[in-house]
From Swiss-Prot:
Keywords: Chromosome, Developmental protein, Differentiation, Disease variant, DNA recombination, Meiosis, Phosphoprotein, Premature ovarian failure, Spermatogenesis. Residues 357-367 have a biased composition (Polar residues). The gene is SIX6OS1. It is found in: Chromosome. It comes from Homo sapiens. The modification Phosphoserine is found at S439. This is Protein SIX6OS1. It is linked to Spermatogenic failure 52: An autosomal recessive infertility disorder characterized by azoospermia due to meiotic arrest at the spermatocyte stage. Residues 356-378, 568-587 are annotated as: Disordered.
Amino acid sequence: MNDSLFVSLDRLLLEFVFQYEQDISTKEEMIQRINKCCEDIKENKVTICRIHETINATDEEIDHYCKHSEEIKDNCRNWKPTCDVFRKHEDYMQDQFTVYQGTVEKDKEMYHDYICQYKEVLKQYQLKYSETPFSREYYEKKREHEEIQSRVLACTEQLKMNETIFMKFRVPAPFPSLTKWTLNIVNLRCETQDILKHASNLTKSSSELKKEVDEMEIEINYLNQQISRHNETKALSETLEEKNKNTENRKELKERIFGKDEHVLTLNKTQSSQLFLPYESQKLVRPIKMHSSEPRVADIKEESSAKQSKLANIDFRQKENDTQIFNDSAVDNHSKCSHITTITSSQKFMQVRLLTPQKQSNSNQWSEKGDKDAEYGDKGTVRQVRESKCTSQAIYTEHFGKSVENDSDEVEERAENFPRTSEIPIFLGTPKAVKAPESLEKIKFPKTPPFEINRNRNAVPEVQTEKESPGLSFLMSYTSRSPGLNLFDSSVFDTEISSDQFNEHYSARNLNPLSSEQEIGNLLEKPEGEDGFTFSFPSDTSTHTFGAGKDDFSFPFSFGQGQNSIPSSSLKGFSSSSQNTTQFTFF
């Protein structure tokens, strides 16, 4: 029983709790609704207040407009009699306007008739007046007055034109007298002389800069060649070391296998150790077979000779390039004699070079001498190239009148007639330099590379008998003409001038240089017979003759030479095709 009661009580409690929760939730919802309704009511009250305010404002406006309408009605009632009065006055004014308009029209017609009558009377009076003599005189004077006025206007226009012309003529002329004109021209000539001197200085400085640039280029090329040679020698030395190692290994193997066949191997190695020369020189060289009883000594000598032959090949090719540059410059400078001497000397040197030594005991000495000669020979080639470039520039400035096509044709023909020859490898020569004459050493010509061969100390070669080098023979055919324009000149290009004649001409030109006045006179086209600075004017300045729009006034200028500028008798030896001066025209 108790259990059932507890269960029922529990159920009741649960139901009450559930209902209580439901009531709480409903109460909260109702509270929320009430709050919302209160807010809505407040908003509606606010809107109602606004509406009441607008209603009150509209009521006030309605009252104001009602009062204003009543005032307007009162005014209308008051203004009605005045309006009636104004209407009556308007009607009266219209009636008066119609009356006045009719009267004005009648007056117009009457006055128009009067005007017509007066015009007819005036015409009658004019006819009567024109018949009188006074009227005729009046009209004649009137016509004369009009003509005089027209003439006066034309004269005033002419006077204005003349005044403008006169004002133009009143401007002062730039040269009021002939003396001032001549002085101005003299000043202009002096200014042109100064400009020409400045231009000559600039040309000299530019030529010097060009020479320096050429020298720097030559030095750069020479350094590049040395670098390439150094690299090639390194590569060759490496290859030779590798080959030597390979040959030593092969020799050891062959000695082990074939102990008795060393004689055959030495023969094959001597055939492979020939000098490596160009194709033309190989035709003249015959292979020399070396027989020795000692195989080791022969192998060492053959290896050293092979090294020398390869180094000779490298230096030989580089010297060929240098000789080609030198020969090209010689052809451009029109020097056949220099070509002939270089060709003959180089052929003689080649004949000596092609003789191979039968003894190879001095191979180490030759290699040491070769290194010294290579350095000295390279310096000589650089000097030769500089020398050839200077001479080519000088002769180009001397013969600038000739066309470029003729020069190119002559260069090609001379290059075909005189073939280029190759030179010997530098290391085969001796460090003894070829000596030039004493007179040429004073002028400080660049030394030429050595062309002597001294393989056998006891034997004297034939080449040492020639004391003059081809580079000096090339320069011997030129003499200095003037320091300003030309550096070298020759009377006949096919003949050579000796060293004594060269010194005589050189001293004569140094003792008697051209003066500044002579150069100025030559620049201003002075005849040889005139002296001094003269002006020639006509006696009567008023009598001028004009022809073809130009004045016949003569104005010659002549600049004289100084007493010290007379050319010496020693200069008569120079027989050149062109004169010593160059003419410039400025005007």
